[in-house]
């Protein structure tokens, strides 16, 4: 395994264990996956949500890990050589919220879909996306303008 010097210091005082193909450490009684230290979510899939730039799955240097889908409910895909972002939410099956040209707008659309689900009486606690590089004003402006699928809105209406 290869690590940056800062991480090497951390791992020198923690034993790296492996279970069912997942690497983790015990830290204060909690099992923490190695990938979670790099901002990769526990449900992430390699080559869909993150990738190793040089192809070496044992190279955990920050420069070698690219996070493709950093937000909940958002998946990047290629359409005619351009990246697009598909937003889905799971309520008794997957519902497509929409397809967006930029990642930030897609993440906000997911948050809006979660808010609409809660307003429709769905009690499930969905994780929400936090966009660091936006002011509250900019976030609110995008939130009000972002469109959500008509099919999704009709589905929510059918639940009421």
Identify the role of each PLM range.
Residues 1-160:
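Boundary-flanking segments of nucleic-acid-binding domains in nuclear regulatory proteins
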């Amino acid at each position: 395994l290869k690590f940056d010097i800062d991480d090497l210091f951390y791992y020198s005082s923690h034993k790296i264990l492996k279970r069912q193909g997942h690497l983790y450490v015990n830290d204060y009684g909690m099992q923490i996956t190695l990938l979670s230290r790099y901002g990769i979510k526990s449900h992430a899939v390699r080559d869909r949500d993150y990738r190793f730039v040089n192809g070496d799955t044992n190279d955990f240097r920050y420069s070698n890990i690219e996070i493709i889908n950093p937000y909940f409910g958002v998946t990047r895909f290629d359409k005619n050589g351009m990246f697009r972002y598909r937003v889905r939410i799971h309520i008794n099956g997957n519902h497509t919220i929409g397809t967006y040209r930029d990642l930030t707008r897609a993440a906000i659309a997911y948050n809006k879909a979660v808010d609409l689900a809660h307003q429709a009486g769905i009690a499930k606690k969905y994780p929400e996306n936090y966009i660091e590089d936006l002011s509250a004003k900019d976030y609110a402006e995008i939130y009000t303008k972002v469109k959500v699928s008509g099919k999704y809105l009709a589905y929510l209406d059918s639940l009421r």
